[in-house]
Amino acid sequence: MQAPGRGPLGLRLMMPGRRGALREPGGCGSCLGVALALLLLLLPACCPVRAQNDTEPIVLEGKCLVVCDSSPSADGAVTSSLGISVRSGSAKVAFSATRSTNHEPSEMSNRTMTIYFDQVLVNIGNHFDLASSIFVAPRKGIYSFSFHVVKVYNRQTIQVSLMQNGYPVISAFAGDQDVTREAASNGVLLLMEREDKVHLKLERGNLMGGWKYSTFSGFLVFPL
């Protein structure tokens, strides 16, 4: 028996001889073994395995995607090339209006019973119209509204309703005859569609003494 030889990768290779004895491989056998080993090492690099094909969706996990668009849609949403809808900074909506004088209601106010305001404190998005004192929703979402209507030097009980598209949603009352100023106050969360309208209406009593210091406020909690 001949002494064992070393093949590729440092392995000892023995080959059978004429009478069943083991012999070392020849030079050609060693070259063939080295070539096979190199081929096995290079095969993964030459033929990579594709995890996804081009038709599979791209999944982003734990990544922050920033989408910039100079012309967002009317509802403040931007759609990226990946089909992802992203709300832009212009989607913020909030308003707050107040009454700064005690002027008596105009003829229009007496006819429609709309409670008007004459000063805007906040109007982000410009969706509150001061002239009509009506807020128009720019998009579907959940909105928060609150109001405080002060009756001044008026002994009549008043009822103030928050109107959504012409229908009363909530009301508040003020009727204490022993105070010179009293407020009818309330607040609510509303589900609104795009272009829904909200305003305040005097359902009962009058504001002939004025309603200075009254406020009407609202903002978008989140879009849907």
Curated annotation (Swiss-Prot):
Q: GO:BP terms for this protein?
A: maintenance of synapse structure; positive regulation of synapse assembly; spontaneous synaptic transmission; synapse assembly; synapse organization; trans-synaptic signaling, modulating synaptic transmission
Residue stretches making up the C1q domain: 88-224
Residues glycosylated per entry: 53, 110
Q: Which SMART domains match?
A: C1Q
Q: Which residues form the signal peptide?
A: 1-51
Which is one Pfam family of this protein?
C1q
What main location does UniProt list? secreted
Protein keywords: Disulfide bond, Glycoprotein, Secreted, Signal
Write down any Gene Ontology CC term. synapse
Q: Where in the cell is it found?
A: Secreted
Note the InterPro entries from the entry. Answer: C1q_dom (IPR001073), Cerebellin_Synaptic_Org (IPR050822), Tumour_necrosis_fac-like_dom (IPR008983)
PANTHER family the UniProt entry points to: CEREBELLIN-2, CEREBELLIN-RELATED
- What's the subunit arrangement here? Homohexamer; disulfide-linked homotrimers. The trimers are assembled via the globular C1q domains. The trimers associate via N-terminal cysteine residues to form disulfide-linked hexamers. May form homooligomers or heterooligomers with CBLN1 and CBLN3 prior to secretion. Once secreted, does not interact with other CBLN family members. Interacts with GRID2, and more weakly with GRID1. Interacts with NRXN1 and NRXN2 long and short isoforms produced by alternative promoter usage. Weakly interacts with NRXN3 short isoform and not at all with NRXN3 long isoform.
- Please give the function described in this protein's UniProt entry: Acts as a synaptic organizer in specific subsets of neurons in the brain. Essential for long-term maintenance but not establishment of excitatory synapses. Functions as part of a trans-synaptic complex by binding to postsynaptic GRID1 and presynaptic neurexins. This interaction helps regulate the activity of NMDA and AMPA receptors at hippocampal synapses without affecting synapse formation. NRXN1B-CBLN2-GRID1 complex transduce presynaptic signals into postsynaptic NMDAR response. NRXN3B-CBLN2-GRID1 complex transduce presynaptic signals into postsynaptic AMPAR response.
> Know the name of this protein?
Cerebellin-2
Which organism was this protein described from?
A: Homo sapiens
Gene giving rise to this polypeptide: CBLN2
